[in-house]
From Swiss-Prot:
Residues 56-76 are annotated as: Disordered. Belongs to the bacterial histone-like protein family. This protein is one of the two subunits of integration host factor, a specific DNA-binding protein that functions in genetic recombination as well as in transcriptional and translational control. The gene is ihfB. PANTHER family: DNA-BINDING PROTEIN HU (PTHR33175), INTEGRATION HOST FACTOR SUBUNIT BETA (PTHR33175:SF5). The lineage of its organism: Bacteria, Pseudomonadati, Pseudomonadota, Gammaproteobacteria, Alteromonadales. This is Integration host factor subunit beta. Keywords: DNA recombination, DNA-binding, Transcription, Transcription regulation, Translation regulation. One of its GO terms (biological process) is regulation of translation.
Length: 95
């Protein structure tokens, strides 16, 4: 599901809100989440999961074109850990 599809689905389910209002709310929510992670804080949404930063240590990688070694710096990357309720719902899916 894309952000546009999410906006459309929520606007349909929440008939008292326009698509523009839903879009604004989703954009603001995502911006606040990004700002929170950017400041190094953790986000927890009970039943859904938590977002945090994990540190990737410096390492030696490879340039796929040339095969030569490349030194990669350490960095922080976003990490999502699903909550128990979400894990159980996904586990129940028969694909």
């Amino acid at each position: 599901m894309t952000k546009s599809e999410l906006i459309e689905k929520l606007a349909t389910r929440q008939s008292q809100l326009s698509a523009k209002e839903v879009e604004g709310a989703i954009k603001e929510m995502l911006e606040q989440m990004a700002t929170t992670l950017e400041s190094g804080d953790r986000i927890e949404i009970r039943g859904f999961g938590s977002f945090s930063l994990h540190y990737r240590a410096p390492r030696t990688g490879r340039n796929p074109k040339t095969g030569s070694s490349v030194d990669l710096e350490g960095k922080y990357v976003p990490h999502f850990k699903p909550g128990k309720e979400l894990r159980e719902r996904v586990d129940a899916v028969n694909v």
